[in-house]
C-alpha cells in the first residue's frame, strides 16, 4: 500500500474535475492537489459533448431570460438561487475558456457565434463546430499542465473515500497499471465522477459513466436527490447510443415520421416553422423531455419507421446543404456515415430517444458541499439544484466550469481550515476497504457480472423509461432486488492484478445497482408527472405542485430498499406556472409585454 499526502483529492478528470483543479491551484498555489481518474483525462466523457455551452452574450438576451428558460425547462424543480448564480457566472467562464485557448466558432464580424438550442428563448449556446466538449476538455487539460502542484493519478480506480469524524479525509484507489493499492490523504475531496447513464441498456454515455461517485457518497450516508429524473435525448442513433447533437436542430434540422410529416406540431410545439428557419422554443427546438415524449406517442400510434435497429423517426438535414453541414456539423456527417451508413447531405438520419443525462445526483448545497464536511460534488454526479426535472441542452457544459470553479475554491477553504486527521483511524478504514476488496475477489458462485448488468439495463429501460406505469416500475424494483441478491454470487474468473477489468466491472456494477434502485424507488413514489418523469396511471398524469413540488432524497439502506425523504424547493422569484412552447409561448410573451406596458 502506497500513501500519498495531498491537500485536496479530486475524483474524476473530466470538465468539472479539471476546472476544480485549476481553480484550487490558482486560489492557493501552496496546496497539493491529487487529480484521480479511471482514464487518461482526454478520454473522460466530457469529450463526447457536441452541441455547446450556454451563456448570455447578446444585447437582446439577459440573465433573467436565461433564468426563466432554465426554471421553466426544469418544470420548477430547480433551486432558484442556484440558477441565479449559474446564469450570472456563465459568461465569465466562457470568456475564461477563450483566454485559455478554446476555439469558439465565430461570426463573420469576429464576434462569438451562438446557436439555438431546445427550450431557450434566445440563442445563447456557444459552440466550437460540433466538437464543443472535446475543445473545452482539451483547453482545460492543457491549462492544468501549467500547475505543478496538480499531481495526476491516471488509470486509478477509486474504491472508497476516507472519512474521519464526519470530515472527508482522502481516498483509497487501485493503480490499474500496477495492480497496487494507493491511499491518498487529503483535507477535502471533490467528486467529479459523471452520471449513471450506463445503468440503462441504450444510452449515450461512455463506458466509464457507471455511477461510482454517486454510489460511494450514497454508502456514506449522503442522499441522492431527484434520481427519478433521467433525460432521454431525442436524437440518438439506434442501437449504438451515438448522439446526433441538438445542434443539428439548432441549425435547422427537422424531425419527420414515416409519412414525412413534422409531427412535433401536434404536441404543443407548433405551429410548423418554415423549412431551414428554426425558431426558438418552436417545433424541433422544444425541450428534450417533450420532444422525446412526442416520439413515444408517434410510436404508439404506429407512425414511426421500422428498421432492423428498432423504431425510428428521421432527422432530416438535407435542406441545409453540403456547405453548411460540412462547416457547422462536420463530425455529425462523419458519425452518421460510420454508424448507420447515411450521408446527411443526401439522406435523412434514423434517430430515436436514448437515455442521456442524470438530472439528479449527490445532494449538495449551493456551494457544492455535501452533508459530509469537506466532501464536494460537481458536474453530472451532483445535484446542486440547477436542472430540476429536465435539463436544458447546453446548460451542462456550462455547469461543469461554473460549479467546477466554485467547488475548487470551496475545497481550498476547507483544506486550509482543517485540523490534522487521525492517521491511525484512516489506516484502519483503509484496511477495511482492502478486506472488502478481497471478499469481492474471492467470492464464489455461478453468476456473471455481464449478465446481471445487461438485465439491469433492460429492467431500467422497461420500468424507468420515457413513460412509466406503477406495474412496470414495480417490476423493475423487484428485478433490481433479485439482481442485488444474485450479485452476491458473482465469481471473478481473472485473478491477476494488472488491469483486472473483471474485478473493476464487478465493482462498477455494485455501485450501479445501488444507484438504479434509488432511481426506481424515487420514480415509483413520485405520484405525478413532471419534466422527464411521466406517468400513465390515473391521477398521476399531471403535475401536482401541492404534494410534489419537492425534491426526493434517497438514502442508502444496507438491509433493503432505499429510504426516501422529501425536501422543499427554493423558490425566489418564479412561481410555478404552466410550461408553454411554440405558438402558446409567443402568445404568452405578447400578453406579458402588454401588461408591462400598462
From Swiss-Prot:
Q: Which residues bind FAD?
A: 12-16, 36-38, 44-52, 156-158, 212, 356-357, 380, 391-397
Active site, per annotation: 233, 249
Single GO molecular function: succinate dehydrogenase (quinone) activity
Q: Name one GO biological process term.
A: fermentation
Gene Ontology CC, one term: plasma membrane
Q: What class of enzyme is it?
A: oxidoreductase
Please verify whether the record's keywords include Nucleotide-binding: yes
Membrane topology value: Peripheral membrane protein
Subcellular location(s): the record lists: Cell inner membrane
Name the needed cofactors. Answer: FAD
Question: What are the alphabetically sorted keywords of the record?
Answer: Cell inner membrane, Cell membrane, Electron transport, FAD, Flavoprotein, Membrane, Nucleotide-binding, Oxidoreductase, Transport
Q: Which reaction does it catalyse?
A: a quinone + succinate = fumarate + a quinol; a menaquinone + succinate = a menaquinol + fumarate
What PROSITE patterns does this protein's entry cite?
FRD_SDH_FAD_BINDING
Q: How is the cofactor bound?
A: Binds 1 FAD covalently per subunit.
Q: Where is this region: Disordered?
A: 577-598
Where is it predominantly found?
Answer: membrane
EC numbers listed for it are: 1.3.5.1
Q: What Gene3D superfamilies is this protein classified in?
A: FAD/NAD(P)-binding domain, Fumarate reductase/succinate dehydrogenase flavoprotein-like, C-terminal domain, succinate dehydrogenase protein domain, Succinate dehydrogenase/fumarate reductase flavoprotein, catalytic domain
What InterPro entries does the database record attribute to this sequence? Answer: FAD-dep_OxRdtase_2_FAD-bd (IPR003953), FAD/NAD-bd_sf (IPR036188), FRD_SDH_FAD_BS (IPR003952), Fum_R/Succ_DH_flav-like_C_sf (IPR037099), Fum_Rdtase/Succ_DH_flav-like_C (IPR015939), Fum_red_fp (IPR005884), SdhA/FrdA/AprA (IPR030664), Succ_DH/fumarate_Rdtase_cat_sf (IPR027477)
Q: Which domain of life is it from?
A: Bacteria
Residues found modified as Tele-8alpha-FAD histidine:
45
Q: Give the family from UniProt.
A: Belongs to the FAD-dependent oxidoreductase 2 family. FRD/SDH subfamily.
Q: What's this protein's function?
A: Two distinct, membrane-bound, FAD-containing enzymes are responsible for the catalysis of fumarate and succinate interconversion; the fumarate reductase is used in anaerobic growth, and the succinate dehydrogenase is used in aerobic growth.
Subunit (UniProt): Part of an enzyme complex containing four subunits: a flavoprotein (FrdA), an iron-sulfur protein (FrdB), and two hydrophobic anchor proteins (FrdC and FrdD).
- How is this protein named in the record? Fumarate reductase flavoprotein subunit
Q: Which gene encodes it?
A: frdA
